[in-house]
Amino acid sequence: MAILGITLVALTGVTNEKAADATKDALSSLNNSLIWMIGIAIIISRGLLKTGLGMRIGYLLISLFGKRTLGVGYSLALADLVIGPVTPSNTARGGAIVHPIMKSIALSFDCDPEKGTEGKIGKYLSLVNFHSNVITCLIFITATAPNPLVVELVAKATNSQIQLSWGTWFLAMVVPGLLAMLLMPLVLYFLYPPEIKQTPNATALAKEHLAAMGPMKREEKIMLGIFLVLLLLWAGIPEMLFGVKVDATATTFLGLSLCLLTGVLTWEDALKEKSAWDTIVWFAALVMMANFLNKLGLISWLSDSMQSGIAHMGLGWEAGCALLMLAYLYAHYVFASGTAHVTAMFGAFYGAGLALGAPPMLFALVMASATGIMMSLTHYATGSAPVIYCSNYVTMTEWWKAGFIMSVLEILIFGTVGILWWKVLGYW
């Protein structure tokens, strides 16, 4: 579909009457640095799987904190959080790294949906597995693919006056995000209490897996070092200490180069990471179309129409923007892709909020938060959802109930603690 979209823009001349210029327009977003940052970061994240570092981190945390079911839940959440910054594919992170750990623990307690024993521990851990994945996506730009698209659309809507860097995003989201991560396992524990409360088997199982893995291999140590370098550079530490700024995309290319030079990854590994190349292509198509929808006036027209409708209701910008945010967030019930949802709705809704008089930075962060929160709603809301759901530990009704309750909790957290924190930071 992405290739079809690029082809149609080039052939129809909808953006430019000159054929050559129309083709340039169709391919214009392939030089977008944010797109390459997310694509290359997905390739780097393959190193967590290939070296086994991601699994080791997960089992290590469970061996330390897994004596109780609640502790196992927090360990899974912390594992997702720790590897989140360098895993833009939340499907890979939640579905291919954390979920197998969760399943092995559940099965060690004879918790098997085929036997009707999913309530022992698996239902609770599955929901923690998923919702920790979603909250991690809120905290880091590089934790899921739609986030860079949000950054791009905010910059376009404000004529580049607001450019959310990796560090700015992290600083804004870390306090409300960590609070949400802290409360989430507790809320789910009371919502769907596991039958098994004590889990000494979990720590023993984790230690067995760690023993089987042996001491950290050379590749794991190198991957861990690259991971730390990326975090330091993305967070802007060199600029703070030495006044040397390193571009976020350049940092990502540095990470991939180090992976290739040290042998942690080969170029064959990079080529086999199809999701990265898919992301670059369809992301480029979506960003290109979003840009030209804005340039051709459609987004402005939709924004003005919504602003006019809200103004006729007699609402101030605060209530109007709250209404826009809620409509945008819960519209995700009819979307199976976060990126498609952002492309279709974010620009118009953000523009309408600005037209109502909302502070641009404040509303950007509110809408960015909503973009993450909406992924918690359904079993098809984001890529990791069907992977975890299809393990059959949770019914659809239970999944949707938990998703709605968590969305309300996260809206309250980001709408109170988040907004106050952003005020302290001087973001509005």
Regions found by a protein language model. Give the residues of each.
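Hydrophobic transmembrane alpha-helices of multi-pass small-molecule transporters
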Residues: 1-37, 157, 161, 167-304, ...
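Membrane-core helix-loop-helix motifs of multi-pass transport proteins
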Residues: 109-194, 385-418
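Hydrophobic alpha-helical transmembrane segments
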Residues: 3, 70-75, 126-127, 170-174, ...
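Alpha-helical transmembrane segments of multi-pass membrane proteins
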Residues: 38, 70-84, 110-136, 163-172, ...
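Re-entrant/interfacial helical elements at transmembrane boundaries that shape
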Residues: 91-107, 126, 139-158, 201, ...
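In a subset of proteins, long, contiguous C-terminal domains/tails are tracked
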Residues: 347-356, 370-428
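Transmembrane helix-bundle signature of multi-pass membrane transporters/permeases
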Residues: 43, 78-81, 97-104, 129-137, ...
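Membrane-embedded alpha-helical segments and adjacent helix-loop junctions characteristic
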Residues: 11-113, 273, 277-356
